[in-house]
Each structure stands twice: as structure tokens, then as C-alpha cells.
Amino acid sequence: MDEEAKIRTCQLLDLPWEDVLIPHILCYLPLQHLVSLQRVSKQFHSLIQVYLTNCRTFDLTSIGPSIPKEAFCSMLKDNKVLHSLSLQNCSDWVTDKELLPVIGQNQHLQRVDMSGCVCLTRHSLVAVSLSCMHLQHLGLAHCEWVDSLSLRSLADHCGGLQSIDLTACRQLKDDAICYLAKKCLKLRSLSLAVNANITDESVEEVAKNCRGLEQLDLTGCLRVRNQSIRTLAEYCPKLQSLKVNHCHNVTESSLDPLRKRNVVIDVEPPLQRALVLLQDVLGFAPFINLQI
């Protein structure tokens, strides 16, 4: 009877933490639930801290705006094994002061997303480049603090980079992008969108050096022309997706060879666009065959 009573009174925290709770239960809970569990009791706080110390992925995308910066520092203060760190939606509070210690003690990071973190500075990117030699994926969209020197540091130290999002990094010009292309030959995905400084020079350098390129986003790169798109078609046989919306100097003459290779392009062919426009303006939907 005593044994049965013990079984009946067994509680969740009585299970082995590192053998059962962490690998088979906590790893499936969203971060916001883990944060809530920390407040239940001292034991739960200790359990969650053990989990956070050993977790490989830390994603603040869903709770970024609501988490205090002090909580962020506390949760990751002992973690030295992170492989992936996402700070999207943390723009209101994350600064170099909070991020630099985390980057400095996590040299195995392969994926870092700082997109939209407007309060960071170039020091954070330099820290990533110096600490994270195994970095493969980097998100810097809308980080206007990214400059040529910090990007060059990244290129010098993270040659294994496979994808980088530089959307709206408007300080960057052709010289920085060309340097990146010459150093990071394994790039498969690149966004240079919303940057009027980018010209054919950047696109051609990327095409000639990054032969395994699969995805390229040039949305809003107003100075890109047909010549660089033709170079892209010549040197990048693995290209799968190209975005050139609002690239007014890129025409169908350079896009057609890519379409014939089934590359997904975000602008319709001229005839298709004309038919859709006619359909919208005149309301002839039942009479127009858009498969012409």
C-alpha cells in the first residue's frame, strides 16, 4: 500500500529533469509557456533555467515585445551551446548591452536573426563575425546601422555563410556587396531589396562568385538593369527564385530565359499583366482566358 501511495503522489517535478522533462516535454513547449512556468515556483524556475542553459534554439519572435530586457539577460546568462538565435520583434528594447554577452559566449551559433533590431549598432555585427565562425544564416533586414566595415568583417570571418538578408540596409553600396560575394562563395540565398545604391556591379559579382545561388531578392533596386540579370542567368544554374518587382530597368528580354528554366519570378510576363489589368478595369473576367 505504501508503494501505491508513493505512485499516486508522484508529481511532475519528481521525474528526472535532464533525462525526461527537458528532452521529452519542455522542448515541445513555446517559449512564452516556459516563461510562465518560471513564475509558478522556485522549483519550476530552476527547471526552466536548466532547460534554457542547455537549449540550442532561442526564438523571441512571438514574445519579443513583451519580454523585459532583464529577463532576456537572465534566461541566457549560462547558455553556451546556442545554435540558433532569433531576435525579431525585439526592436523596442534589445541593444548591444544585452546582446554582446550572449554572442560572446555562444561560438557555435549557426543562425542569427536580428531583423528589425534598430537599437543595435555595428558592434553587434562585428561581435557576430568574430565569435560565430560557423555562422550559416543571418537576418539583418531593416537594420540600417549595418555599414560597409561591419559587413566586411562578417565576410572575412564567416566564409561558410549560406544565406543573408540585407533588405533595406541602405548604408551598403556596391563595394561592400562585391566584397561579400568574393568571400562568401557558398551563398544560396541573398536579399538586397529596397536599396537604391545597388547596381549591376553587385549583381554581377554575386552571380560570378556564388554559383550555387538559389534565391535572390532585388525588389526595389532601381538601378539594376538587364545586363546583370543576363549574367545571373549565365552563371547561376541553380537559381530557383528571383524577385525584381519595382526594378523598372529590368525587362522581359532578360527575364524570359529564366522563365524557360522554371525560375519563379515575382513579376508576370507583359501579356499576362496586360490581361489582368484589362480584367480589373473592364470586368471581362468571364471572357478572358488568362492561360494564353
Curated annotation (Swiss-Prot):
Residues 12-59 form the F-box domain. CDD domains: F-box_FBXL15. LRR repeats lie at residues 134-155, 160-181, 186-207, 212-233, 238-259. GO terms for cellular component: cytoplasm; SCF ubiquitin ligase complex. Keywords: Cytoplasm, Leucine-rich repeat, Repeat, Ubl conjugation pathway. Belongs to the FBXL15 family. This is F-box/LRR-repeat protein 15. It comes from Dicentrarchus labrax (European seabass).
